[in-house]
Regions:
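Short, contiguous alpha-helical
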Residues: 19-70, 111-139
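Short acidic/polar alpha-helix capping motifs at helix-coil junctions
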Residues: 8, 46-47, 84-85
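An N-terminal domain-cap segment
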Residues: 1-27
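A structural signal for well-ordered alpha-helices, especially hydrophobic packing surfaces
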Residues: 12-15, 41, 45, 103-110
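Acidic/histidine-rich alpha-helical segments that form the ligand environment
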Residues: 67-116, 135
Length: 139
């Protein structure tokens, strides 16, 4: 969890660069990527908090295993769900608000039961400790 919160601190330092863009890496600017990561944190935290541990389905996923082992998600292999895509126009205040919301969401996971989980469309059900690692790797 410390690593995830540190990433959010780093985002705050990078926020003034929100309009910067490197077309060799991505069509989207820095602000879009920060907001996307924050929206992912918010949506996953919400799903974890409301999950019912009794409905958890354990299933081994080689893809999840490799991503979490290598601490890297291959670029360009998946499309972000629409609810994790920021609006087309990104402002500094929007970026800072998303960082603050993501920090609150991440901190809410500190009191969540470790048996809670969220369902990833490719990796399946990920319990809280694994989900936190996934958030760090993704972010």
């Amino acid at each position: 969890m410390k690593k995830l919160l540190q990433v959010l601190n780093d985002f705050e330092k990078q926020a003034p660069l929100y309009l910067n863009n490197n077309k060799m890496v991505s069509e989207a600017n820095v602000g879009w990527h920060i907001m996307h990561s924050c929206l992912v944190i918010n949506s996953i935290a919400k799903a974890i908090i409301v999950s019912d541990p009794a409905l958890y389905k354990k299933k081994f996923s080689w893809k999840a295993f490799l991503v979490l082992l290598l601490n890297k998600i291959p670029r360009g292999k998946a499309k972000a769900p629409s609810f994790t895509q920021p609006a087309s126009e990104v402002t500094m205040s929007m970026v800072l608000q998303q960082i603050e919301d993501a920090r609150k969401s991440a901190e809410s996971l500190l009191t969540a039961d470790k048996r809670h989980y969220f369902t990833h469309p490719i990796f399946g059900d990920l319990r809280l400790p694994t989900a936190i690692k996934f958030l760090y790797v993704h972010t």
